[in-house]
């Protein structure tokens, strides 16, 4: 597995797909300097009507959410995101997580940078980022606040909350063993063709130099499975308003995991939407306009 660090150039005119973002860095509790991006809301909405703190998915980076940021900005909503350690322009071995708690520290640092006094803010995560956001909210924010402010809600886009239905139990157990004895074993690759039905999205991903196209190390995959089990144990305590959406034809994360989470979460205000025919990235798929419209509507309804 490649262990190179990301480019250090974070100047406003540096290359990368972060159009419109204000760039800086934020330091985690364990001393990692993460690349931080803030897409401001439209000029007519300052301060913004709401702020969304986003954790991206495995092997991608925050810049892929620039189109989402533009749509949110039109609605007066600010988007703030980091490149998780080992992703995008943040330092560290590519897509390596010695523990899922490393990503939780990244998310904690993001929230510290994203929260504004008197502005409603939302936790959001896509795919593995959804795992991180859900685990953080359930373990650390049940009946509590983040940086002195209680989040207005939790938004999960195609979250990785359960192993695939076709994955046998022995394979899950074997992944834990391999993670211990050969943690950097190249376990799998992500096929861009499974992201969306839009060929332009697939090709853009294939050609994006900040996306990790190599194999995912066994330890990282095993730690995501560990996070799933931790979420199962604590989800009943999660009392924030929750929005979960997933594509019915997602082959990268399990839609049934979202259904089960919505049934078992402690929140009395949980909305689940399964988009028929959509692949993994519903916000980039052919029906993305209605997906993002529904997201904006939900945020607006929970920002009062």
Where are these regions (language model features)?
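Conserved alpha/beta-hydrolase "acid-adjacent" motif
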Residues: 251-257
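Conserved alpha/beta-hydrolase
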Residues: 69-93
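Alpha/beta-hydrolase-fold enzymes
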Residues: 126-216
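Active-site glycine-rich loops that stabilize anionic/oxyanionic intermediates
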Residues: 52, 57-60, 128
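Catalytic nucleophile-loop/oxyanion-hole region of alpha/beta-hydrolase
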Residues: 59-62, 88-117, 291
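Catalytic active-site module of serine/aspartate enzymes centered on a nucleophile-bearing elbow/loop
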Residues: 269-304
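Short beta-strand/loop motif that positions the catalytic acidic residue
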Residues: 238, 244-246, 250
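An N-terminal hydrophobic leader/cap segment in hydrolases
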Residues: 1-42
